[in-house]
UniProtKB/Swiss-Prot annotation:
Function, as annotated: Variant histone H2A which can replace H2A in some nucleosomes. Nucleosomes wrap and compact DNA into chromatin, limiting DNA accessibility to the cellular machineries which require DNA as a template. Histones thereby play a central role in transcription regulation, DNA repair, DNA replication and chromosomal stability. DNA accessibility is regulated via a complex set of post-translational modifications of histones, also called histone code, and nucleosome remodeling.
Native source species: Monascus purpureus
The record's account of how the chain is modified after translation: Acetylated once deposited into chromatin.
InterPro entries, sorted: Histone-fold, Histone_H2A, Histone_H2A/H2B/H3, Histone_H2A_C
Biased composition annotated in UniProt, kind: Gly residues: 1-12
Protein name as catalogued: Histone H2A.Z
Protein family membership: Belongs to the histone H2A family.
Subunit structure: The nucleosome is a histone octamer containing two molecules each of H2A, H2B, H3 and H4 assembled in one H3-H4 heterotetramer and two H2A-H2B heterodimers. The octamer wraps approximately 147 bp of DNA. H2A or its variant H2A.Z forms a heterodimer with H2B. H2A.Z associates with the VPS72/SWC2 subunit of the SWR1 chromatin remodeling complex. Also interacts with RBP1/DNA-directed RNA polymerase II largest subunit.
Alphabetic keyword roster: Acetylation, Chromosome, DNA-binding, Nucleosome core, Nucleus
Molecular function via GO: DNA binding; protein heterodimerization activity; structural constituent of chromatin
Compartments (UniProt record): Nucleus; Chromosome
Modified residues (N6-acetyllysine): K5, K12
GO cellular component: nucleosome; nucleus
Length: 136
């Protein structure tokens, strides 16, 4: 077989595809996020184009997927509490700021997220003292 990759020449087997289908790194690891893309970003964003191991990319991908699932679950709960079906930046803000660990991890400002409803304790004490004076 000139020009083709057959078994007699030492290619990868039958060209008609009788072998197993290729599995991506994400599928092997049981992940939804793309390990190959994360590996490419890791390689491109390091100084001096350093080498990145395949397991490092899988690990980072798994962490990103877990954090995304955690934030989406909390934001979905916030949307459900407000009886709406669409997650908005406000729900993301409430979810992230409501969880202590996520709040310390994500210190970014979320656009159109608003602020948490909170009244300073000192201001509450002044209002209570005024009520007591008017009652007496």
């Amino acid at each position: 077989m000139p020009g083709g990759k057959g078994k007699s020449i030492g290619g990868k087997g039958d060209p008609k595809g009788s072998g197993k289908a290729q599995k991506s790194h994400s599928a092997k690891a049981g992940l939804q996020f793309p390990c190959g893309r994360v590996k490419r970003f890791l390689k491109n964003n390091t100084q001096n184009k350093m080498r990145v191991g395949a397991k490092a990319a899988v690990y980072v991908t798994a962490v990103l997927e877990y954090l995304t699932a955690e934030v989406l679950e909390l934001a979905g709960n916030a949307a459900k509490d407000l009886k709406v079906k669409r997650i908005t930046p406000r729900h993301l803000q409430l979810a992230i700021r409501g969880d202590e660990e996520l709040d310390t991890l994500i210190r970014a400002t979320i656009a159109f997220g608003g602020v948490l409803p909170r009244i300073n304790r000192a201001l509450l004490l002044k209002v209570e003292q005024k009520k007591k004076k008017t009652e007496a």
